[in-house]
């Protein structure tokens, strides 16, 4: 009887030791990279919330940041990086939320994307006061064309979604194209898909003797500062909320004149094909 009690006591001690060990074991930290600019970071965090990864506080009209995470059951660490650089650090994190233009350029495929009800139109912008110039109207007409719409739909097959409404033949009847013959329109753009889309508009303008000079930028700041400083006639690289926020923070005078496309944000991983890394 004494031996039975002794064995029972030993078993009880072992159970308690194992229980305390399990309780004390730290849950693995899951690193998720997101874009660092305010609008895209907030957008990424909302996508993670929709996916059940974390829960955000109600921030009202303010953009959510990682400090607004209210519930973090998966022990997620948010890693911020400039939007264009997120694909390059994918190997160093468990997951990354990436804008599809940068993902396409890097040859990446998401395992989940934003819903079809989420739209952040990427826009052609000019400096305030230049909305009605013949250069601007000629540029808008060339982009808001059947040629560009067909290119977006056939090339990206939904990875990039066309937002052009009623399109035309590429020309504006109110523009004096003869006066623009021999002139250059300089526009700043991200490489993919913006510069590729603009290449189609370039051909449309060339038929009227107008050169579209496409300057490619790899970041989210220089296209706006160059436009504000008069080095560019226009830019096309970002969505409306980003441009609104940029104006508010920098006192710039950037206005958007055409919604062209939107890029569904997706979740990517070089290790997992789903959210199994959270388990």
Task: List the predicted regions and their residue ranges.
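Short helix-initiation/N-cap motifs at beta->coil->alpha
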Residues: 60-88, 214-225
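Short, well-ordered beta-strand elements
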Residues: 28-33, 180-192, 210-216
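A conserved helix-loop-strand patch within extracytoplasmic ligand-binding domains
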Residues: 27-41, 45-47, 51, 137, ...
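Bacterial N-terminal signal peptides that target proteins for export
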Residues: 1-11
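Beta->alpha turn/N-cap motifs
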Residues: 82-83, 91-104, 191-192, 218-220, ...
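Ligand-binding clefts/hinges and TM-proximal coupling segments of bilobed small-molecule sensing domains
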Residues: 58-64, 140-178
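Periplasmic-binding protein-like
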Residues: 104-134, 140, 165-173, 257-269
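C-terminal motif of bacterial Sec signal peptides marking the signal peptidase cleavage site
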Residues: 18-22
